[in-house]
Amino acid sequence: MDLEEQERDILIQTDDDDCHVDVSYVNDDDDSNASFSLSQNDSAFWPQSYRHSVDLLTGVTPPMVSFIQGRSTETSFSSSIASLYKRRPTSIANSFVSSTSKQPLLSEKDDVSFLSSQVGLSNTDLSYGEPNFCSFPQSVLNGINVLCGISLLTMPYAVKEGGWLGLCILLSFAIITCYTGILLKRCLESSSDLRTYPDIGQAAFGFTGRLIISILLYMELYVCCVEYIIMMSDNLSRVFPNITLNIVGVSLDSPQIFAISATLIVLPTVWLKDLSLLSYLSAGGVFVSILLALCLFWVGSVDGVGFHTGGKALDLANLPVAIGIFGFGFSGHAVLPSIYSSMKEPSKFPLVLLISFGFCVFFYIAVAICGYSMFGEAIQSQFTLNMPQQYTASKIAVWTAVVVPMTKYALALTPIVLGLEELMPPSEKMRSYGVSIFIKTILVLSTLVVALTFPFFAIMGALMGSFLATLVDFIFPCLCYLSILKGRLSKTQIGICVFIIISGIVSGCCGTYSAIGRLVGELNWMVQ
């Protein structure tokens, strides 16, 4: 019997009525154990597609692409599925030998069936090939790519809002979110059944926890798509500022025209069945961040804009907005479990986090200091909007800020699309490619409507950072950790988690209130 048949023989048929999970933890003294038993019907496993779509989003397990044969989508999913069986053989075997009523948290066979229906393949098309685990350098690049994204552009604006001392909060947020990333790792290590953040939520709080965390993660991705539209619109308006258009008595200014144009540009990329090329292009985000930082420094030092001292030390009135932006800069916990699961040496995951967060903090602080020193109180929500257009470095930075969202938009929207398609009736008609195109188009148009209604890049980022990021990156990792490993934690560990939870609640409430107030003020100004 070949390897593929052996792997398939270990699969246990999923019970159609219910699914039971038993996750046990035994302390070092063997005196007591904490047992978590999750029992839900098949619908409790929504979303099943999350880990695969996030793998494509981050490129954590790069597929072997074959453009000539047109099989890159199949290979990508095959590699991702195969990794489920080859990550920890002994743990996987143990999860199957307990009893026939005890199934894995997510049935891999169900994943194969669902994914094959999404891409129009039979189960046999999704063969279990050799998984492509990431080396340590690849994992570091993936971590940096996830963390150091579009929020880099708005760091100087955050310093303007909070003052120079706000950078201390940025540093503290980096330490806290790096620590909560390690907490997620410890949760994943507690059971081989746990693969993703929603899995952790279910292990901690049942299906309710899985549902809440999944919705929050999808909301993060949706807001990122809105930010991509605003980002492209703002930078194109910077290049072509005086364009207006009148349609049936409706006057459109330059930002509105380019928001619509940007949506029309990214829409065909969302329709693609094969997103592997976009995934590879998006994986170069770390180099894009370096390029943007170098362009900013070049304009300040070589092109003669110069650096100036001054600025506020601390602005308590606007500090909550800065807090939200700083939180937005570290909102990568949605995919950290995928990076961990993709590593050849998962024991080095804490070092991956340390290097990734350290790199991001260095670049965030460097760009924040450089941008605010160059433009002072005139700094806009994206530093590319302040850079003089006559310089080559400025043009490179602006067009980079335009092109990058084009490669990321479809990847960010895909997990949401697959999650919604799971909720559709399981009929061939409702799972057709035409229905998928319709769902994708509606979602894209909805992001355009939101971007036109709230065209404020920094404020939307602050709102996302204050509300979503504090929940996903601060509060829930600690709550899940305390729940899953209760009875095994020291008082110090519990105290640290409680401190982080309280800090997250306070900063989240203050930042959300301030961001909403600023949003209302900007809308009133637009109306006037």
Curated annotation (Swiss-Prot):
| Biological process according to GO | amino acid transport
Task: Identify the keywords attached in UniProt to this record, alphabetized.
Answer: Amino-acid transport, Membrane, Transmembrane, Transmembrane helix, Transport
- From the Swiss-Prot or TrEMBL record, state where the protein is found: Membrane
Membrane topology classification: Multi-pass membrane protein
Q: Supply the InterPro entries for this chain.
A: AA_transpt_TM
According to its record, what are the GO cellular component terms? organelle membrane
Q: Which residues cross the membrane?
A: 139-159, 164-184, 211-231, 247-267, 280-300, 319-339, 349-369, 398-418, 442-462, 465-485, 496-516
Which family is it part of? Belongs to the amino acid/polyamine transporter 2 family. Amino acid/auxin permease (AAAP) (TC 2.A.18.5) subfamily.
Q: What is this protein called?
A: Amino acid transporter AVT1F
The organism's lineage?
Eukaryota, Viridiplantae, Streptophyta, Embryophyta, Tracheophyta
